Amino acid sequence: THHPEGKALMDLTRVMPLQETIMEALGVPINVIEKLLEPRAKKIDRALHADNFNRVADAARLLDIPFMNCHTPADNHVHKFLEKIIKEKQPKMRYLKDLTEVLLGIPEFAEGAKMSSAPVIVSGSPKSKLGKIAVTGMTGGTSGNEDIYESLSQAGVSTILAMHMSEGHREK
């Protein structure tokens, strides 16, 4: 599986510090990041402890089926890949529509678009200027704190490229 199950799911908050590294590299002060991520990690931890986290791994063991997941390494790869593409293409991109076109030029994004899962602009329009692009939400276990966007904006970030964005994150 890609998403964590069993012990890996219970250890989810151990990979959240990756979010600190990413945000700090974007110019957000570490004390601000820690203040925002700590309550989010505690919330995730509480939610996980109420879950029957080992059911899939237990079922695989009972059925004598090999089972593993590879979540963070895959997400790290996606993060680095997209950062590299953005760095290469940013001088030629000016608008959100340009970023969308670059993403759709990646075979996996093109295939996703065929299955009704194309990149979506959730704030702004295709003609909105890009500014500084931040690749976030690709790794680090789960979405970060919804209040991080103000700090990213203060660090000069104008555009967020994220894998998942909850309604609460969109509202911010």
Predicted region positions:
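Non-catalytic interface/targeting segments
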Residues: 3-159, 167-168
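Active-site cofactor/substrate anionic-group-binding motifs, chiefly glycine-
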Residues: 163
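CN hydrolase (nitrilase-like) catalytic-core segments centered on the catalytic cysteine
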Residues: 170-172
